[in-house]
């Protein structure tokens, strides 16, 4: 599937906040938004009034960029969220959180969602004992995600496992550091999703 291949630091500057797309670099003084907190481009430092539509569009773009999803796939997630019972915006975020690449990132087994996506594609993880290399795979309560035994010998995986052992995952994920595996305890509640997104604006945008 096609992916954005430009500078991810520009995306953070465009949205006006850290999206943590570059992993460890985002926590250092080298982070682009710390050095230049205005939008990229010739008129990036200019001030302009943003319309209601503009606010809604920016919120959708922000969500897409946080989770690293292209427009067509994001739209499909929204349509699926609409068909589910409950609040559409919360359903949307819940679907995005359940992506396997996001779960790996939340567990600390990827410094960024992009790295987590690459590790999933390279087949380093299993779900319920079977290797899964599809980043968009949606986990469900009761699923067990584990690092493959062969992958534990990789220097990068070893480093990530050490870091994950010191990290507290979201409450909907139960991580056993000594076994290098996690269990999906429940679907994530809205207050367990720390994505800085106003999902109601996305719903308003797609409802136009």
UniProtKB/Swiss-Prot annotation:
Which GO terms label this protein's molecular function in UniProt?
rRNA binding; structural constituent of ribosome
Q: Which domain of life is it from?
A: Bacteria
Enumerate the spans annotated as S4 RNA-binding domain. 98-161
Provide the alphabetized UniProt keywords.
Answer: Ribonucleoprotein, Ribosomal protein, RNA-binding, rRNA-binding
Report the sequence similarity comment from the record: Belongs to the universal ribosomal protein uS4 family.
Functional note: One of the primary rRNA binding proteins, it binds directly to 16S rRNA where it nucleates assembly of the body of the 30S subunit.
Q: How does it assemble?
A: Part of the 30S ribosomal subunit. Contacts protein S5. The interaction surface between S4 and S5 is involved in control of translational fidelity.
HAMAP family (UniProt xref): Ribosomal_uS4_B
Protein name in the entry: Small ribosomal subunit protein uS4
Provide the organism lineage as a comma list.
Answer: Bacteria, Bacillati, Bacillota, Clostridia, Eubacteriales
